[in-house]
Amino acid sequence: MTRTFLFLIIASLLTRLTPAEAQNIRPAPRPPAQTGTPPNESAAPDGYAPIPEWAGQTRAPRAAKTAGYSVETVAEGFTGAFSFSFLPDGRILVGERPGHIKLVGKDGKVSEIEGLPTTLWARGQGLFEVRPDRAFATNRTIYLTYTVLPDGANASALPRLPAVVVVARAKLSSDDKRIEDLKVLLNAEGTGGRLAQAPDGTLLITSSIPAGLGINSVDWPQPQALDSNMGKVLRINPDGTIPKDNPFVGRAGAHPEIYALGFRDIQGITINPRTGKLWTSEHGPRGGDEINAVEKGKNYGFPVIGYGREYTGKPINGDKTRQDGMEQPVYFWTPDIAPSGIGFYTGKLFPAWQGDLFVAELVGRSLVRLTLNGERVVGEERLLTELNSRIRGVNEGPDGALYVLTDGNGGKILRLAPKP
């Protein structure tokens, strides 16, 4: 989500590499490619192509087009929509970053839900998630994540410096017009705020590195620091208490809510419904966008290892891509695609897609389908390229169709169903 802001900075900082610098980042030959059709991605303009740990960790073969689909508009006119989720009856909650919750009826009509706190700070990125509890049908509970100003900070003086991500719980009123009984569960320094609810009911929340901390990896020590929430996946109970089995509970100086560490800018989060495991999508700096299968207590490397570069084009930490005790991504893209929301498909309308991971793509303006063998990617397909729209989110609907959210002003929710 920091990409738009960073564009102007990057443009002013990029310089031509000297021959020596170019030699320093030129990788050795990669492992043999997987068999199959050519990958979707072209190489980076300067030829940079970091060496993967295994064939298929990047630039997987182009997946076969196994399903035709039709696209219909469910609702439109959203401004800065960042997330959407389904209520049990099929209606849709939409979170807009400027600070609005929208409710999409089954007829496609859009209404606004009032009651967001006035402390929400849109310039710090605003409203991120609006997600119903797994037991919403009986408790009408929803969870929110949004940014507020740090205590004592001046919004005009600190337009993009570190915000505070708030995780809150509230009730949706019986008439669906407002949220009530809002309770703050957690305040975490950083930005981001994607949220998923695990099968055991616990809440998994992301907190990323704000743009205001700088553009070089040396400016980002927080993802490796257990006394900071930045660059982490956090885990709390639905009442805001800390699960006793969190990995760093009781460790001196560590935040007990930390579940996993070593991330830069998580943009998507989902639970694999078949395994119950958490998966994330992440923006690298210049290249090195990642998909990770996240486990409790594990370290995902940033900024010590990674498959991207500084915005100046120089290597990060000597171009290091592996280190003992740090996890490898399931998949990465270089050059970057700016992945956003992600979701697994398990429905019956598209049998050929069952078990596939779908990734909303901002830069390439497509919906990415990753075919998997366990936790290894074996194919990649780009969908919806004909729309030429930035895709912000993707979810399977209760009807088994696939729904996507487009980005920006005039955003839409689209429904993908099999062609008649």
Task: Report the location of each language-model feature.
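Repeat-solenoid scaffold signature
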Residues: 254-290, 295
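Conserved blade-ending motifs and adjacent loop-strand segments that build the rim/top face
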Residues: 263, 377-398
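Acidic, Gly/Ser/Thr-rich repeat motifs that build Ca2+-stabilized beta-propeller blades
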Residues: 23-214, 268-271, 276-284, 335-373, ...
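Internal metal/ion-chelating core segments
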Residues: 195, 202-260
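Surface-exposed loop and turn segments in beta-propeller and other repeat-based domains
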Residues: 111-125, 182-192, 229, 238-259, ...
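Sec/Tat signal peptide C-region and signal peptidase I cleavage site
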Residues: 18-21
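Beta-propeller blade signature
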Residues: 162-175, 221-239, 293-295
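Bacterial N-terminal signal peptides
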Residues: 5-16
